[in-house]
Amino acid sequence: MLSPQFLILSLISGLQLLSLADADPMIEVFRWKQMDFYNRGDGHLSSGGRKDRPSFSAPVVFPGKYSRRKRKIMTSRDTPVVVSSRADSDDPNASYIPYNNVPMGATHFRGRLFVTMPRRRVGIPSTLNYIDLAEDGSNRSPKLRAYPNFALNQFNASAENLVSVYRTSVDACQRLWFIDTGMLEYPNNRQQIRRPSIWVVDLATDQVLKRFDVPESIAETGRGLASITVDVKAGQCGDAYAYIPDLVYRRLYVYHLRNDRIWSFEHNYFNFDPLSGDLSIGGQTFRWDDGIFSITLGAQKLDGSRDAYFHPMASTNEFVVSNRVLQQESNAARSDHGNDFRVLGSRGPSTQSTMHAYDPGTGVIFFDEIQRNGVGCWKTSKPISAENYGSVDSNAEDMIYPSDLSIDEDGTIWVMSNSMPIFIYSTLDTSIYNFRIWKQKASLAKRGTVCE
């Protein structure tokens, strides 16, 4: 006969296994050792490539106009001198250098997965790309297609073309929004070759609907413009607002599409936390001082307003402000914002985050966790705290530095992990998989966590 102690232990073990079974980790969709393109820009096309051929004329540079003093503490946008010296050997006219292509953003919309490739080194054929899931979805390491076409990605062919894009966003009107930083972030040779700009593309026609150059009076350079969040209701597409965090200058920019105007908010909550800037990721130990990095919009309230949740990357705190405050241009000129900007609380130790996104179907915000190499979650109906902050997945081997997180219209979370600290401070091993894209339904990702 089985002893009571054995039965109790068996029951506990079974409950633990059931709890583990309820949890649904992120699913690896794609992985790459090095990135490749259908059109590398060298005149040699892979299957499915276009016959566009780039011009290699020198870019137009504004010498010294946007220069900044060297920073003693670095952001994620800086490169150490020891690493910069290795990049000096790159051919400045090379159209494609495989090692230099590090993907940053991933956004899905109806069978197309948009993947960005910021120009932090030479040899990047196209900064804005996509994967056709119907055609290439079965390939675990698919090549990228330039979007909306290869020609528009050739910054040195026209002053109207794309320079460098970090992340994208799809709005309720089926439009793709992104910031072109206008900057070539080459080691020891950072160049602001044109003004940073906001772009809007119609995903039904792939036509550019709008390009807005950010004036120098608002943002001196595009160096800190790494993401964009769009606030618009379906059926009111002309009345869109875009919220753009500046991680370098620690500001929040608001662009109004209808009036074609942009304004800038400043607040202490946009600064990095000096106690949260020491990081250890992928075997690299370093210090970053990235300020406000990500903004996500919560559920619509009875009065029609929405909360805008935000955080600096070098911080474990979450903050909030009403979108009504941001949309009033006159508020940006105030010297004191009173209690309009609020501290919600800390997510807990080692929860520094790049991007986060709110899922309306579950009421949960999901976070990229760079220290934990994973994805976290918080149910917005609960107070934010370490106890109410959950872990969806964590993988120190395969999910090194999750750089982007977005949720599509079907409630699927998409995450990019790109080993960026290893690329910046050491050397990527090109014999192993360095870049991955993951996905999971938000309704499943929260199972078995405190975010239920």
Swiss-Prot record:
It holds the Pfam family MRJP. It comes from the Eukaryota. Its main location: secreted. The keyword Glycoprotein applies. The keyword Cytoplasm does not apply. GO terms for cellular component: extracellular region. It is found in: Secreted. Keywords: Glycoprotein, Isomerase, Melanin biosynthesis, Secreted, Signal. Pathway: Pigment biosynthesis; melanin biosynthesis. SUPFAM superfamilies: Calcium-dependent phosphotriesterase. It catalyses: L-dopachrome = 5,6-dihydroxyindole-2-carboxylate. One of its GO terms (molecular function) is dopaminechrome tautomerase activity. InterPro entries: 6-blade_b-propeller_TolB-like, Royal_jelly/protein_yellow. Residues 1-23 form the signal peptide. Its EC number is 5.3.3.12. Glycans are attached at residues 93, 156. It is an enzyme of class 5 (isomerase). One of its GO terms (biological process) is melanin biosynthetic process from tyrosine. Tautomerization of L-dopachrome with decarboxylation to give 5,6-dihydroxyindole (DHI). Also catalyzes the tautomerization of the methyl ester of L-dopachrome and dopamine chrome. May play a role in melanization reactions during late pupal and adult stages. Belongs to the major royal jelly protein family. This is L-dopachrome tautomerase yellow-f2. It comes from Drosophila melanogaster (Fruit fly).
